[in-house]
Amino acid sequence: MGPVQQSVPKASIVIPSKNGGALLGVALQRIFGQSTPWPFEVIVVDSGSAAASLEILRGFPVRLHAVEPTAFNHGLTRDLGASLARGEHLVFLNQDVVPCDDRWLLTLLEPLEQGEEYAAVQGAIREFPDRPRFYWDSGGARFYFTRESERWIHGHGGIGFSTVNAAIRRAIWEACPFGDAVFMEDKKWQHAAAARGFRIAYQSDAAAFHTHNYDMPALVRRCQQEGFGWRLLGETYSCTDMLRDTLSPAKYGDLWRGLRAGHVRTVAEVLFPFIRPWLVFRGNRLCRRYPA
């Protein structure tokens, strides 16, 4: 059936955006090409896009809601989008995420449609096959090799909940919204949901493409933000953790193989296994404010 016209939507897809550009247009084209037996809607909460990106958004039947750039907050902005939604299920996507096929939405919501067992669903995240990408990837164990990430996933049923590609039952969100979160709104929500006994399903076939290609400043900022975000969640990354992760040998063999094959090309890619532990530690223990 596809995008909603007048009928009440089964799902509301919420996308925070700012200068999403051409890739957001590709994502929306794939979203509005979804094959579903029920209607859905797309809500974009935009925080200050330039005219070119706004023109792309207006080329699609999205419900566009604007907020001031200074008002953007990873948790509260998603809550705003959810509050505008009419669907039974809330789907959260980043603006640079493209569903892999036309059954992504239907597959993502299957666990929620089949009964009341699950409160939320985590979709799979894959790297774009045809875009430049950071050697260490950006959404898996090779990037998140440090112990705080391992501890979190181990303590939460093997899932690190991510609003890059996820769905939450609307009634559950109403009882457990994201709240104020400058970063890691998804992990904050996961922690609160687990405390209430809510379960999250993993749908490997509900996959979407998402790739980062970090330069050095972006990499430093990202890793420090993670450390700071863990601190806000009460997770400690100690000096001992940092030293053990720095000295762990497996990633250096991976680095050597990447260098020999010519896949490691940038300074950021060379330094990543050495500096990620320190940067996470710095964000977690030393930064007094969010490292923007």
How would you describe each model-predicted region?
Residues 149-168, 182:
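A recurrent flexible, glycine/aromatic-enriched loop bordering the glycosyltransferase active site
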Residues 183-191:
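Acidic donor-binding loop at a coil-to-helix junction in glycosyltransferase catalytic cores
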Residues 46-54, 97-98:
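A conserved acidic beta->alpha catalytic loop
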Residues 68-85:
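Glycine-rich, basic loop-to-helix element that forms the pyrophosphate-binding segment
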Residues 221-292:
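Non-catalytic, C-terminal membrane-associated alpha-helical segments of glycosyltransferases
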Residues 98-135:
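Conserved donor NDP-sugar-binding/catalytic core segment of glycosyltransferases
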Residues 90:
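Short aromatic/hydrophobic "clamp" motif used to bind/position activated sugar donors
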Residues 123-124, 139-158:
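Short, flexible, basic/aromatic active-site loop/helix in glycosyltransferases
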